Amino acid sequence: MDPGVGNALGEGPPAPRPRRRRSLRRLLNRFLLALGSRSRSGDSPPRPPAQPSPYDGDGEGGFACAPGPAPASAGSPGPDRPPGSQPQISSGDGARPPGAQGLKNHGNTCFMNAVVQCLSNTDLLAEFLALGRYRAAPGRAEVTEQLAALVRALWTREYTPQLSAEFKNAVSKYGSQFQGNSQHDALEFLLWLLDRVHEDLEGSAHGLVSEQLPPEVSKISEDLRPSAAPTSLGPSFVQSHFQAQYRSSLTCPHCLKQSNTFDPFLCVSLPIPLRQTRFLSVTLVFPSKSQRFLRVGLAVPILSTVAALRKMVAEEGGVPAEEVILVELYPNGFQRSFFDEEDLNTIAEGDNVYAFQVPPSPGLGTLSAHPSGLSVSPRLPVRDSQRFSGPLHSENRVVFLFCNLVGSGQQASRFGPPFLIREDRTISWAQLQQCILSKVRCLMRSEVSAQDLGTLFSIRVVGLSLACSYLSPKDNRPLCHWAVDRALHLRRPGGPPHVKLAVEWDSSVTERLFGSLQEERVQDADSVWRQQQAHQQPSCTLDECFQSYTKEEQLAQDDAWKCPHCQVLQQGVVKLSLWTLPDILIIHLKRFCQVGERRNKLSTLVKFPLSGLNMAPHVARRSTNSKAGPGPWSSWKQPICLPTTYPLDFLYDLYAVCNHHGSLQGGHYTAYCRNSLDGQWYSYDDSTVEALREDEVNTRGAYILFYQKRNSIPPWSASSSMRGSTSSSLSDHWLMRLGSLNNSTRGSLLSWSSAPCPSMARVPDSPVFTNGVCHQDKGGVETRPLVRGVGGRSISMKASPASRSRHGPFKTMPLRWSFGHREKRPGASVELVEYLESRRRPRSTSQSIVPLLTRAAGGEETSASPRSDGTLPAKSEDSGRAIGQGTTGVPLSSCHLNHHPALGSLDDSLHTARTRTGNVSQDIRLPKKFDLPLTVMPSVGDEKPARPEGQKMTPWKGSSQVGSQSSPPSPSTGLLRNFKDSGPGTLPKMKSKAAMEERAPDKDRGQGTFTLLKSVFWKKEHKRTVRTESSPPAPPISLGSDRLSPAAMNEQALRIRESPAKGLGNHMERDIRSAPSSLHLPRKASRPPRASTAGTSQRTIPGEQISYGTLQRVKYHTLSLGRKKSLPESSF
């Protein structure tokens, strides 16, 4: 039965029962949430629930979601959200990337929203907070956890107004100054928030979750990572990335001794260079009929009072300053009078300021009706003592300022010029009316008579209430009204005492007496244009602000300093300079200045660069052996060396700006931030987010600038690609590694990333790139443009302990940045041997690289023909040592190709292979993701080589795997035979090596490697036999020597070129036709072909000398990297 029907009939259960059930369930849920929060926080007091704000509504912010449970704290998994509680992504957010989300204003919280948006777009901090990579003390990281939840919600598009309200409650709980809905300074809140995060994470090593760096990363960054302070476990995240040091040096002018003091800073407060004057126009009022008004331009001091302006006007008019009255006159009449003690900044540039001169008392001097220029002359030559013997104001004679208005009250409009009269307060209304008509007689029609017109107007005292400020025409003495007395008693020092009166005319009377009146044009003097040009919109550069910050200042005499060396008070020279630079540089522009009780906001346009801010000129210059300053901070962050050595340590890129709009008494905060996904700028005005052009970022309201060091920008950030290196797609962003992303949110992010974006380029996974490898000379500094340091590696890209245990201690993470400039065109591909030549030695691994290369080849069929000239280049210095230690490369000289006339065709094929890099029939290329085009060695399983008579075959272990019934002898056995006469101590060593290699297990030998060695060594043995029969004996050489004499090398090279090698004619010709050349390795287009591929390192009999070509470093083939034999470090 329907409950409503049952209740109506008096049957069924009562209606309040379901409501009591819901209330009981809600109470139980609150109890469970409170119990869970107390168990997580330990002994900390329970957090008060979020109080509903009167500003929380559906109209502002565009959110209509009901309040949900509190977000999970950073670093701990929160409760699962019900399917229906997740906020849906609005269609308007589809065009914006993640992170471009507004924040609701909870009542004058624009300062908080702007700072949170700037911190949310800080790449390092956003990844650190959103992924929960911090370890905070229990119960004391509530502000940090709420900030992390808010940042995570902004990037996952799960923001609700409740999250920002809870963050504000946490801020109010730990910062009493931010309670309520009062306005606050954004810089004050930023410094408080960073200090609070530092305190929350203090005591933990860097504030990070305990995680061990890979050995190669820890070895590289050992010198770059700041050392820990001696009194703590290590610097927090805020100290490591936001904090740096500045040096204050005090130099004695007598002995030139310098005393240095080092202090930390979170932001650099830069003074804005001030113009000492500003433009202001004042209209001078003359009593003459020919010229009534004249506007003059003045350059008034910025920090001054109205007394200075009164003095300048008096000097411009040639009158005493005590006779000048300054008032503000608008189209609706008088507004206010200016007195000497008022701040000059109360007068804006566009205010209409009028200056009146009070005529002197009768007998003391008169004013001329014809001013010459701006001066009022001639005056009677009276002395000052005579002129000011009597006061300008007495009880009976008062100075009155009049202005004519059409209408009454605030709707009145002014017509005609204002005028000044000095009258006795005892006059009647008729006398006062005739005095006023005499002043406006020049504006009246000629046929109108001013006699017997009755009451034409009403008079009102300006500055008082309209109800009680009108003078009565029925009074015998209307100027003795109490309103006039009150206006005279409200005066302050500055100019003669006066009373402002408004004469209000009726519209019909005005039309009958004056007709159609037009506003009189005010003439401008030449000084107006001249001062306007001199005071155009003031602007300066950020570099000028830094120069003003670091300029030298001499102490005043009252602030003299006692030099410890001279023991005398000296006016030392103080200079501030930056000692170290942080990863995140926060610059505060001092727009609010206060001198005494006067405060003002500077609207100077500070031109700051969006990218490439060079901080090298503002860092203290010091040599490489200089020591850091005393104290614990010197050991925390070591000083950087010369700026010319590491230029990337001094380049910064802008990513956020906090703006202030308004005045010092009240204003509004907004934020301009660059998104790390698309690299575009967005304007954040509370809940409103709009796209912004780069030329709109620099405004007069810029208050706080956020810069990030270029070599500390994460590689996944779009700001990285803007600076010259290659950025990755959304899959490399830390946002995709957020474990709380569900499938729908992840799909929406991926669908957004599928839109075309020019800044999303693919990052190569291999550390070898198509550009030329930078070689490093011994003792020099390797120069690589735009190389990112260890600090630029993303925090979440470090290998987990589980992956390290699975891959072994030498597992290296793939590099995610490019060593080349983004705009540089990729050149020809390079081989692996050139990569090894750059001294970047690969880590040894237990897995063979042959299966990897075979799979990477994409299943291409390779020819199974042997190589008759398969060689690897020999190195210059350590060739003998490498061969003696068991290197896998077997170098041969390219001059061996001249042994037979039938090899002439091979030279042509080599030349053709060098010019044609796309020969797919002979060179099998690897996929582009390896970027290492190499030639895969063919197998010799189908070849049946001819053996010379008398040569016995040595059985090869594991030869059945190759598929050949007869195999050539092992390399060690062949070397034993060749060096049997080299000396008494050589044969046992070679025998022991041969025995060790024969006892080696089959699993350690790669099939492709030994296939290559069998064919190469068999052909070498055959050629050695023929060469030995025809070559004359030579003095023996020692295998222990690493080099041969130049005479022996030249003699052997000449002998090899002249030997015909007649016994191998048919055999070598047949092998050359059937085997592809292994020398068809692609060369860089910019490098010319070498004269000889490599030097010879064959093992010969003692009577044979070894020939060497151009000495070069050995180049190892890819197939030799799968072996376990360690390579000497000097060979690279």
UniProtKB/Swiss-Prot annotation:
Residues 941-950, 994-1006 have a biased composition (Basic and acidic residues). GO terms for molecular function: cysteine-type deubiquitinase activity. It catalyses: Thiol-dependent hydrolysis of ester, thioester, amide, peptide and isopeptide bonds formed by the C-terminal Gly of ubiquitin (a 76-residue protein attached to proteins as an intracellular targeting signal). GO terms for biological process: protein deubiquitination; proteolysis. InterPro entries: Papain-like_cys_pep_sf, Peptidase_C19_UCH, Ub_carboxyl-term_hydrolase, USP_CS, USP_dom. Keywords: Hydrolase, Methylation, Phosphoprotein, Protease, Thiol protease, Ubl conjugation pathway. Residues 101-710 form the USP domain. This is Ubiquitin carboxyl-terminal hydrolase 43. The gene is Usp43.
